[in-house]
A protein has these predicted regions:
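Phosphodiester-processing cores and adjacent nucleic acid-binding clamps
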Residues: 1-166
Length: 166
């Protein structure tokens, strides 16, 4: 008898991740159910437009919805919109652990649009420190802070970057 292996995708883009995601929420959730998954995350780029549809679809299928977002983090300040560096950013996946985390995630994403928008909705370290409660952060993708630093060959800086989010 083989033991059931549990697996949850924690970094998932839907059709709301423009130019990056193509999965339609309903189909995605149904497929997760077919594969025997009991939970699934949504982490669209810089937006939470699909969260309500995702939540409802997951509940209908008996899957635990994990609400998240892959945010863009400005290297310095979200208000910096004049320097060459201000167009750069790194990715960070944020997952709501509880209701407080969900509310903080909504604040972060909203402020990314209202205060930090420069080509993309950006947050910064100040906002992440202020609204971190109830949120789990992962290093995202190759555009994440740890991966970018490792790719550049800076192990010690990457380690410091990872430890910053503990």
């Amino acid at each position: 008898m083989s033991e059931k292996k549990e697996f949850t995708h924690l970094h998932v883009h839907t059709e709301y991740s423009l130019l990056d995601g193509s999965a339609k929420i309903g189909e995605l959730v149904k497929r997760a159910k077919e594969l025997g998954m009991d939970s699934l995350a949504i982490t669209d780029h810089g937006a939470m437009f699909g969260v309500i549809d995702f939540y409802k679809a997951c509940k209908e299928e008996g899957i635990k919805p994990i609400i998240g977002c892959e945010v863009y983090v400005a290297p310095k300040s979200r208000f910096d919109k004049n320097s060459r560096e201000s167009v750069s950013y790194y990715h960070l996946v944020l997952l709501a652990e509880n209701m407080e985390g969900y509310q903080n995630l909504i604040k972060l994403v909203s402020l990314g649009y209202t205060e930090g928008f420069y080509y993309k909705p950006r947050v910064d370290e100040e906002l992440l420190r202020k609204y971190h409660k109830g949120i789990i952060a992962t290093s995202a993708c190759l555009a994440g802070p740890v991966a970018k630093t490792l790719i550049n060959g800076s192990y010690d800086i990457a380690k410091d970057m990872a430890l910053k989010y503990l």
